[in-house]
Each structure stands twice: as structure tokens, then as C-alpha cells.
Amino acid sequence: MNKFVSIALCSSLLGGMAFAQQTELGRNPNVRLLESTQQSVTKVQFRMDNLKFTEVQTPKGMAQVPTYTEGVNLSEKGMPTLPILSRSLAVSDTREMKVEVVSSKFIEKKNVLIAPSKGMIMRNEDPKKIPYVYGKSYSQNKFFPGEIATLDDPFILRDVRGQVVNFAPLQYNPVTKTLRIYTEITVAVSETSEQGKNILNKKGTFAGFEDTYKRMFMNYEPGRYTPVEEKQNGRMIVIVAKKYEGDIKDFVDWKNQRGLRTEVKVAEDIASPVTANAIQQFVKQEYEKEGNDLTYVLLVGDHKDIPAKITPGIKSDQVYGQIVGNDHYNEVFIGRFSCESKEDLKTQIDRTIHYERNITTEDKWLGQALCIASAEGGPSADNGESDIQHENVIANLLTQYGYTKIIKCYDPGVTPKNIIDAFNGGISLVNYTGHGSETAWGTSHFGTTHVKQLTNSNQLPFIFDVACVNGDFLFSMPCFAEALMRAQKDGKPTGTVAIIASTINQSWASPMRGQDEMNEILCEKHPNNIKRTFGGVTMNGMFAMVEKYKKDGEKMLDTWTVFGDPSLLVRTLVPTKMQVTAPAQINLTDASVNVSCDYNGAIATISANGKMFGSAVVENGTATINLTGLTNESTLTLTVVGYNKETVIKTINTNGEPNPYQPVSNLTATTQGQKVTLKWDAPSTKTNATTNTARSVDGIRELVLLSVSDAPELLRSGQAEIVLEAHDVWNDGSGYQILLDADHDQYGQVIPSDTHTLWPNCSVPANLFAPFEYTVPENADPSCSPTNMIMDGTASVNIPAGTYDFAIAAPQANAKIWIAGQGPTKEDDYVFEAGKKYHFLMKKMGSGDGTELTISEGGGSDYTYTVYRDGTKIKEGLTATTFEEDGVATGNHEYCVEVKYTAGVSPKVCKDVTVEGSNEFAPVQNLTGSAVGQKVTLKWDAPNGTPNPNPNPNPNPNPGTTTLSESFENGIPASWKTIDADGDGHGWKPGNAPGIAGYNSNGCVYSESFGLGGIGVLTPDNYLITPALDLPNGGKLTFWVCAQDANYASEHYAVYASSTGNDASNFTNALLEETITAKGVRSPEAIRGRIQGTWRQKTVDLPAGTKYVAFRHFQSTDMFYIDLDEVEIKANGKRADFTETFESSTHGEAPAEWTTIDADGDGQGWLCLSSGQLDWLTAHGGTNVVASFSWNGMALNPDNYLISKDVTGATKVKYYYAVNDGFPGDHYAVMISKTGTNAGDFTVVFEETPNGINKGGARFGLSTEANGAKPQSVWIERTVDLPAGTKYVAFRHYNCSDLNYILLDDIQFTMGGSPTPTDYTYTVYRDGTKIKEGLTETTFEEDGVATGNHEYCVEVKYTAGVSPKECVNVTINPTQFNPVKNLKAQPDGGDVVLKWEAPSAKKTEGSREVKRIGDGLFVTIEPANDVRANEAKVVLAADNVWGDNTGYQFLLDADHNTFGSVIPATGPLFTGTASSNLYSANFEYLIPANADPVVTTQNIIVTGQGEVVIPGGVYDYCITNPEPASGKMWIAGDGGNQPARYDDFTFEAGKKYTFTMRRAGMGDGTDMEVEDDSPASYTYTVYRDGTKIKEGLTETTYRDAGMSAQSHEYCVEVKYAAGVSPKVCVDYIPDGVADVTAQKPYTLTVVGKTITVTCQGEAMIYDMNGRRLAAGRNTVVYTAQGGYYAVMVVVDGKSYVEKLAVK
């Protein structure tokens, strides 16, 4: 046991320092800079801060472990534990440095035993199990470590040489037991005349690292270095394996587009084979190029593609970035897209681009973080923290920064499901500190096998991972980090967007310092070290680790690998929008362009097609972008990125050469709710792009020209024409030949991929051209001096359109056969399109030759439209001149339309669109999807605060639904009331045009904050109050509001409801309160030039019992008028039933949206508890409950009220409660109030004292609370009728003491009244296709869904628009229900007899299922067939778990009375020697049968398995692990009711239980598999031609009477209790009807929906009900409606029947 103690020291010497009990340790700086001059003299002062001592048990008794702020123990094992503290200084580039102590102060403490150091502890070790060992130093009469100030060897960080000064303020003499405590040390670090080690040959400073230097070096002075060039960004090189070169383009284009100059280098072009040394040398050369701006390197490929640098104990990517000097400080940030396939790479590219480009204000998962910690650590860890303390410090930091939700998963008891739920619920950051393996986290055991359960599509966190070998990408299978980066669900990225993880076993303490610093940088704790990229945050975090932990920190840095893009712009909180304006058009000759932006620090970039022309940082609201490299671009892209901002992408036109492809014209955009509608006119000259006879030239890639002209003639369908033209290019009689390979497999074979030599000499094989199906000229011959070639003239060949490899041969006499030089002279997999002519014109190009390719259209001019939103393509292939998109996110968007012609695309035409309030059309809530067999069931809750947003209110509403509708066309009705509460004589007034315009009308009402006619400034407090209303169940209020003056729009108002009177004092709590913003101009009406603002529709839920509604204009002054119009109120016919699950509440806090009263005043009222935080707790549903205690560490006398929100109209309340089954008497009552929420307002309607509640056969582990066990009872359901007039319901816990607790969950209120017609319906989509609309129920079922993963979405359709879709993924796996086998159909008389075999004996509705049965452990249940009735089989299996040939035994007690006596609840079974009859006297069954109670026994299961058959029933049991080395008979696992030891476990008859032993973190554990032998229960259902004709069959045969004369399709499915199997079908063909699989004497075609039958006989077409639809001789044509049809043809007396489908 550790104990924290204080040592009384002289406070004056310690500067007021306090010694206190340890809590979470502070991290305050205790080193300051006193003086720093350019003469390279730096004075630094250390002061002791927060010195503490921890008592630990050692072989010499209790000893002390000292700690202080930022002190780190680097003492060798066996040496006294004496932390030191380090700081980095910038020093001379070349000189040796020295340190001198200028002054110091200390005190001494006598008779102190300092504990010996345990040395550096790795994270694959348990610190508690490492003993304290006193070394030789404890016999030496001197102070350790000796020097109080030292210098480390110098290092180089890019352009600055640094050196670490170390302070050792604790000096200890182990012989005299004297501890000398230096409270203050002042040192001077200065140059000497000697040349130092690791000198810096300075080239200048790249400005992008200024903040890093300021943070790293406490004496850094920017003025000491002259930057070569001021740049806001560096450069990135992507080193890519050759096989992925073509897949990286989108990533590189995006990086350039967002302002990071990015280049590509193929790894095999650096060296072949690729080596680590070659990569290292290449990066060094790139770094040393002029400009010194290489900042990022991204490696693309796995280790076998681009190897990591391997040295003893090191597997490193990071060393590639360590360039200057011989230290371990990176100059370049390194990352890796580790991939083994193109799919692996694509998902990493997609997730990175989406994260930087497409995140919006709707991404509410940002700002939510997950902290995971092991239950280990402590004094030997960084800052003396346990992993949990460490993560709590991080969690507090994140909360202070603005993170809105922190999920804490701390051992013991964390499960994979906890992690899966956290990811799938949406998180943006993960900090993990604990054990790890190559494929999993130790805490939770969440690993690569669980990744497939993640559904967090594009809601991707980045991860700071402190664990062993999670990043070992040299492992034999994908490591944990790789799995998270490659994860995807239904083609969408899941998992993580970036992770830093180690390739080796990490040390215990040093990575914690790195993780601390990463989070501090992320949360901007260091103003001089703000980093916005994942590489910048993580690398700078590791620098702090190296500074503090020296050599061990260097090793950790080298192996801590970034998986993902190091330049990734990280996001922490929900983004906000930027307002960006830029010129609509610029000149190509402009030297710069100014972009206005309201976010300083944003980066604005001009680019086109992935090429960057300029980039600048926004300063003082403007980015001035200097432009270079513009040539003839007709449109440019402006991209603006900012920290925690939505990315803005806009199009800028230029005055470049006119694009030959005409754009659309008259583009317009309108919005309705969240629906955007675009309309445009077709291009002005539709054929301009293809029929203009004037030749135009456009560069399509480097040195390749595409010329477009009209074709002289049309080609035959499906063909392309290839033309070769040359005119004595070399003037030597040589010419050219084109070779075309239709199999397209000759590139890299006959056509070389890496050279322009087709054949190296003139010994040319006669069959060289044999693989080429087509040549130009057609008789081209392979020779250096060929007979057939094109020297001066033109030849052509027509080929089938398709994919070809091709090359243009250029024979040279007496030399070789070349491939022509520049342009498209050889291509791999080139597509020649039908209807086009490809004209290759040979020319001299520079010192060589090449070709200009002209592609001519065959006379057509077809085109389609492509639509973009915010720079992202959202629809292509359109032919109509309109487009609609529903569910668009709130905010400003840019929509663009371009025309795609066959030979090119037009410039984009764009329009800005503003979509108002996403919650205007509320979506469904709590959508869930489940599947049984092939049936999918969806369930959801109605929209919250459902509006009825009708922009044109009906002046004649349907009676019974609309209570009030007022448009104020005739002024303010007499039934309305106005109150001028401020008494200035100016209240609400009617207004009419001209001057004041209503919404879509002439009149409205208004209130003034500024009066015309000399009145001037007003400070209104004006009420406009409705007539009396009757809303017993509440209602919906909608109205329209605007500011009369768009330039003075900040009018403030509120909406209130009163259930009593209509005086101002009756309106207290605002239902809606806001200040208007104009945002635009809608109406041309004006008062003295004041332009009216935009009308906004608002919706407010009115509470039950509302009698009056008031509109109050107040807290406004010196604006103008507020206008109000079209007020409508609809009554709710029935309040929706609702259930409180407490899932939105926070653990340890009062439940959200409920009122609590602690009437006894003991400070302990109702609060939320989460099973994710308490291992003894199991919620009724979800994870959260509410609880009240009568004992919690001490006896309590509770009187606690839990009060609902207003539930007016409720008739029943149903709820679930649970108590401690050992102390079940916690008394409670259900109470109601018809008035208020004070305790005195409530009366009892039901109360009880729970008693005699059983456990229900399960316990839920042991509590970590003060008094140990808190076994929870089963959940008890209660339903209580509520009297009429109930407004509030309270649960009161009282009249009890010194018991334990009562828990409540899933409280459901049933509301009364009769429903009225809804104002909306539901529409259901599957995989993007609408499958059902017009639904009014909140459930939907669909049967017969295809196997695989499906996305189901539900949207709400309102009168004026639709809600965003809410979606859920559902997986259909019908094969879990085995089908019949060998189905046959045979004639028997006039009947058809079906026969089949039963499904496979393995009962598949008992398919594999995983359930939690203990703390972090699982049971797997799957079918089996090898256990007899009334018996159970137990199997013990192992595979040399510990590698030392120790094994396991299984002990079973049929009397089930040994648990807690012979079998301890925790700890080993015994230590030392046990009674020889221990087993025989207590356990009836053993595995192995000869198991004996001896720790050295060989009667164990080491490798293999043993088994025993036992009677089904209740047993106590345990699994033992004899260990000779410790002399203990261990019990596997960690104790408690788990699969390794159990009290009263039921082994059910007819089942087999297999216990497989495994390693589990630092210990062992078991997985239990249960196989079920109960017989299958199912029946058969028979279908004929798609119609069910028989169900409930149990026999494997069926007779279909009277059906043998016709052809039919028969199907049989198996119906299980839990679902149905896939159908198995067979076609029945009667005798005399020919099999259509034979040669058919007819033709049958389906084009669209038209069926055509041609034969030399009679043909008939039937539907599947046997109705004849068409008939005739020779040819029959029928237009179908979709579905299945049958065709019968009779030719020469034989009948032929064929079934077909029409889509």
C-alpha cells in the first residue's frame, strides 16, 4: 500500500512551498530565464515547486519516493530515486558550452530513507510487480547524483542548435541518510573558445518553425536569425510505391488546392529495390534544397513497399525526418498511409480529404473526446500519476478548452462494447494510456477484430496512443493502427483519421509526458507554440518528452509512428462559418488578388485542377494572394481553410482564352426549407463544342495536345477511326507505324513501360508485331527499314471501340526501332471511344519527335450537366435543366453547374445559396433498425418540437385543428390586447403599404424602437397578446417576423405563454427570445429609404394549458421597427407518449430536464449513474439510471424528490426500479401535483417498500465503492394510473435508512386525448431509393430484403419542405437460417410432387452470439450436436498459454457450497502445500480426471484439451493454474464471478461448455463457448410462381394437385422461430415441353419494357397469374409494366416456355 506523507521544512527557505496530500499533480513551470544575451550567455534559475514524498514498502522497511513538479526519475535501477528537471536552451552554432552554478540555497533533512529506483519500466510490465532492490550506491558515503547542474550533448532542431541544462535539486547520501533539498539554483550557460560537438552549418531560418523554436528554447530570440523567406506554409513530398502512383492524384490535388505545395516521388525512382538508406538520403537532399522549406513527408505503402529504418531495438519512420546533426530532433514531420491494396489507400485518402474539406456546422460530434486508462501506474510514472490520474488531467484540460463531452473508460471493467459505442456515438479525439499489443488495446481488449463493428462513417477522431506495439506495421498481419486507418463500412471510412502509435514496447513514463504536451499544444496552452496539423502537434509533444527523458525519450520518439497525413489540419470543436468575399473575375495578368475573410489566420489559396498559383494568410481581414504561373485558365478555384472553420470553396472566372465548350446560362437558385432548386437554360450554341470548324487547341497534359474539330463523316456504330499522318519528319526517308493491341496486355511486354526503344537493334523478329490485331498501315512490317510505313502521307484503320495498348513505332535504318518521343506515342489501357476519329500527326518536337492527337466527333453534339456544391461534385449525367437537393445543411453554399461534352467541359456557372435553420423541419428521433431473417423493422420517435412550417398559411383553416389565424390585414382585432409597459405612448400598431409591407400581404403589425417625425430614440417594452385560447394539450405557434430597417435590424423580442391571465405579470418564462438579424433584403417597401429586412418564419411549441400568448418587444433602442405577421396557432389533439431513459444525463450529476429536491438537506439527492462508470450496475435499457441512496459510505435518512417536467394530459406512468437485493427495503412513493413543483404541492398516489426481491440468477461483479459488494436486484416493472389534472409526477425516496439505494429507469408516460390529423408524414429510403412514403405510424417493416448491408433512412415530409434524413445501417444475413437441400419437382399423374431434404442438422437459428457474463469477459453461444440429454459436457482447452509448460485444471463442485470457502472470492486457491484430499473431498468432477492439488503437478492441461461429462445442474467451479516458481495454485483471471471461477453456475443439460485459456493483459483469462444441442424447430412454406400456396408443413414433400400440365416455378423456404431461410427454387417443365436451355427455335428480346418474340410458329406472353397478355404468329410484341412474365412458343408441335423479368 502506498501512503503519501508530508515533511515539515522551513517555509522561508522553500519560498512558501507547501507539502500536502497528493491529488492530481500540478504542472506549473518552476524554471525561469533571468538573462540572455547575444554573446551567448544565458542565466537560468530553478526554484523547487510542490515537493512531495510517497511512502513505499521496501526490503529495508518503509522508504520515501520524492516527486516535484516536472521532475523525472532517470536514476538507474538500484540507485536512489532522485528526480531531475531539464530545460532546452538555444546555444552557439559551433562553440562548446559550459554551465556554472552562480548561486544556490538548500536545506537538509536527516534520517531519511530514499527508496531505490526501479529503473525504466516498459508498458508490457506491471510496475507493482517489480521489486525495490538496493544497489551498491547505498554503501557509498557520498551525495548522489553529485552535480546539481549539468549539460547534455548539443542537438539540432532544423536551424537552431540547442542544449539541455539539467537541474538535480535533490542530493542524497545513503550512508548518513541525509537528503539535501535545493530550493533555488541559479546557473549561467556560456560559450567557450573550443569548437563543440554536433555543430550547425547554418543556411537560414524557415519562418514556418518560429513557434516551435519559441516553445522549445526558453531563450530563443527570433532576431538572432534572418529568415530566408517569409512563408505561411512549407512543402510536402509524397513518396509513393510505384503500384499506387496513379491512385494518389486526388490527395495531391487537394493538398495543393488547400495551400500546401505538394509533390510526388515514386519510391522505385529513388532506388530499386527501395531501401531505408536511399529514402533517408533522398529526404535529406530535398530538405537541403534552396528555400529550406520541406516540412512534411508522407510515405505511401506498407513496410515491404517503403521500408522503415531498422536498427537494434528500433523500427522507425521518424528517423527520415532527423536530418541536421546527429540527434533525435526531427526537422521534417513524417507520416505514412500504410496500405496493402488500392482499397486500403483510397479510404485513407477519402477520409483525409473529407475531414479537411467537407466538415460543417452540423458535425456535432466534434468537441467530444474519449479518455481510456488502465488501472495501473503511480509513483514511477510521469509526475507520479497513475494512468487514470493522467487521463483525468487531460480530460480537465480538454473541458477547459471547450470540449463539450468527455467519455471516460477506465479499468477495471472496460469492454470492447464501451469503445465501440463511444466511437459510433461520435468523438473527435481519443487519448489512450495503458497496455497494448500488435492488434489491440489492453484496456477493453478492443482490437482489430472489433473494428468492423464501427459505424462512425466520416465522424473520425484522431488518436494519441500510449501503448506497446499498437503501431508495429511490420507485424505479420495488419496492426491495430493500420486496422483503424483502413476501416470502412459500406464503402465509407470508419475508425480514425490519424493515430500516433508505437512500433515497439513503450516505456511507462516518458510517453505520458509526450501525450501531455500533445494535448497542451492542442488546447493552445502555449501561445508561442500553436500547431494546427497532426504532425506538428504530435512531434512538438515528443520534443518535450525528449527534453525531459533524454535517451529513453529519443527511443520513444523514433518509434512513435504517425499513421495518416502529417499535414492533416486537426479539428477540435464544432466548426463555425467564415464570411469570404472575392472578385467574381480577375485578369490573367493580375499580379495578386485580395480576398476578404472574417477569420484572421485562415489560409486562402488560388488553384486550378490541382495546381497552386498562390496562397496567403488572412491578416486584418484580408489575404493578398500573389499569383504566379497563370497561363490560359478560364476558371480558378479559391479555397479558404481555417482552424475549426467550415472550408470555403468558390469559383473565380478569368479573362483567359474563351473556352470552346459553352456553359449554361441564366442559372437561378431557390430554397424551400432545406430544399434547394436549381434551374438554368441550355448552352447558347449546343453544338459549339463539337461542330465548330475552326480548330481549337487545349492542353490536356504535359506535351499532349487535344485538338477538336468536326468530323468529315460518321463512323459505323461501335467503331473508331485511327489515322496516322506524317510528312518526312526527319528528311531521311524514315517513317512511322501505329501498333494497336486489342487484348491490351502488351504494355510492359512488347511495348516497354520504361523506355522509348521498341527493339534495340536491327535483328528484328519477323513476328514482333504478331500480338497487335491492328496496325497503320494495315500491312506494317517489323524492320529497321520497313517496306510498309507512313513517311509522307496519311493512312487509317477502323477498329472496334474499346480499350487498347498502343505504340507509334519509328524505325531508324541500321540502328533500332524507336517509339516516337513526346505526346501520346505509347499508352497503357487507352480507351478509343465509338464514333470518334483519332488523328495522330507526327512532328519534330525540340530535338526529337512526337505526335499531336486530334479527336474528331462523328457529327453528334450530346452533353450532360454536372452539379457541384461547395466544390464537391454531387450529381452528374443530368439531361434536364433543373436539379433539386433536399436536406441541405444550414448556412451559405455555392452551387455550380458545368456542361460535360464528349471532348471536354465548359466553365462552371455558379450561384450562392443561403439555407435557413436546419431545425425548421425537425427530423425523426431515435431511429433504430433490426433484422430477423430477411425482414427489416424500423422504429423511431416523432420529431421533437415538430413545426408546421407552411409559408402560405391557409386563411380558412380546417375547423378543429387551427385555433387562431391572424394576418392583421384589417389592423389589430379588438379581441387582441396591447400593453405599453414602458408608458411612452408607443405600443404595437397596425401598418400598411406603402412603407410597411406584410409577409406576402399589404398589412402587418409593428412596434418601434425609433420614432419618425421628431420622436427619436425609444426604449420599448410593448406586449401584443392573443385572445383567450383553449389548449389543454398544448399547441404549435407559427408566425413571421422581420426588421423594418435592414441596416438597423437588432430588434429584440420574446414570445411567452400564460396559463392564467393576460396581464404583463402573467408572462414570465420566455418560450422564444432572440435579436433579429436582417441578412438580406426581401421587400422593396421603404420608409424614407429604409429597406425592409428579410421575413423569417418562427415556430414555437406551446405548453399544455396555454390560455394566452404574448409577443413582447423590449431591450431594444435606437433601431427602427419590428414587424409581425401571419400568426397561427394549432391545438395538439394528443400529446405524444414519451419515455425518459436518462441517456442524455451525465454520470454523477442530477438528471437532465428533471427537478430534484433534497428535502432532508444532506447534500445527497437523486443523481444519474452510468454502467460505463460502475461495474456493479446494469441499466434496464441503455447505460444510465437515476439513483437515490439510504447508505453511501455512511447511514443516510433520505427525503429526495425526483420531479418530471410538465406532463399535463398523462394518464399512466410505467417505470422500472431495482434495489440492493441484500438490503431491499428502500421505501419510495409516486406522487402527483396539479399545480407546481414545490415539495408541498405533491400528494401520494402509490407507495411501497420493496422486499424479498431475488437476484434473478445473476450478479454483476463487485463494487469499487467503500463497502465492497452492491449486488443489484432484477428490474421490477410498475404501472400507476394518474388522476385527471396531473401536471407533474414525483418519485419520493424516504422513510428508510441505512439500507443502500433505489434505482429508476425507463419511465414512460402515457398521454390521454384523441389524436388529430398529423401535419406531416414519413418517407422511408433504402440505399438511397425511396421505398415508402405517406406513412403516419412510427414503424415500418420490409420483408425479403437482399443479403448484405443496407442503409435505411427516414425523412419527415412537411407541407412546406422536408426534414434532414435520419439513417441507420442494417445487415441482412439470411444464411444464418439454413435452407432446404436438393429440391426436386416431378409429375405424378396430373399432380406435381415436390421433394426435398431437411436443412443441415446444425441448427442455425442458434447462430453465433456473444453476451457479456462478467467483468470484461464474454460468452460465445453457437450450435452443436454432440451432447446427450440430461447431461452437459465441460471442455478445458489451452495452448501453452505462458510458454513455460505450466497448465490448467478444472474443478467442479456439484454441491455448490465451496465458493467463498474452498474457492476464495479473490486470490489463489492455496499457497504452498495443500491437503492431499483437497480435490477429492470437495470436487466431484475434475479435468484432467487425475488432477491433484500440488503446485508442481504434471496432471494439467498444457496444450490440447480435456473434457468431462456431468449431470446438468448448479455447480461451483474454478480453473486453477499451478505455478511452481511462486509456490501458488493460482485461479485464472482477476477474481469475482467470472468464467474462471463461479458461484452457483448452471450447466444446462444438452449443452457443451468449452473453456479456452488465453493471455489477458498481464494475467490470464478464459473464453467460454456454449454449444446447444436442442432440436431445430421449423416448418416449410411452399410457393408457386411467387405465390404462397402452403405453409406450416413439417414433412419434406408436397403434392400440388392438378398442376402437371403447365410449367411453374416452385420455391420452398424454411420458417424458423427467429426468421426464415432463403428460398430454394426449381423450375417444373411438363412432359412434351422442350427445355429452353436446349437450342431455341425463336428469339426473345427485352428493350426497356418492350418484349419481342420472333419465331416460325405461334407465340404467347403470360403474366405470372396465367393470364394471356398477347399472342400471334411469327412476331409478338408487348409493352410490359415491370415484373415477371412467361413466354410460350409452339414450333413444329413442340412447346417452349421461358420465364423473364422486366425491370
UniProtKB/Swiss-Prot annotation:
Entries under Gene3D superfamilies matching the protein: 2.60.120.200, 2.60.40.3800, 3.40.50.1460, Gingipain r, domain 1, Immunoglobulins
Any GO MF annotation of the entry: cysteine-type endopeptidase activity
Gene: rgpA
Record key words, sorted: Calcium, Hydrolase, Metal-binding, Protease, Secreted, Signal, Thiol protease, Virulence, Zymogen
Organism: Porphyromonas gingivalis (strain ATCC 33277 / DSM 20709 / CIP 103683 / JCM 12257 / NCTC 11834 / 2561)
InterPro entries in the cross-refs: Caspase-like_dom_sf, Cleaved_adhesin, Gingipain, Gingipain_N, Gingipain_N_sf, Gingipain_propep_sf, Ig-like_fold, Ig_E-set
Intracellular or extracellular location(s): Secreted
Propeptide: 21-224
Composition skew (Pro residues), residue ranges: 946-958
Gene Ontology annotations of biological process type: proteolysis
Protein name (Swiss-Prot/TrEMBL): Gingipain R1
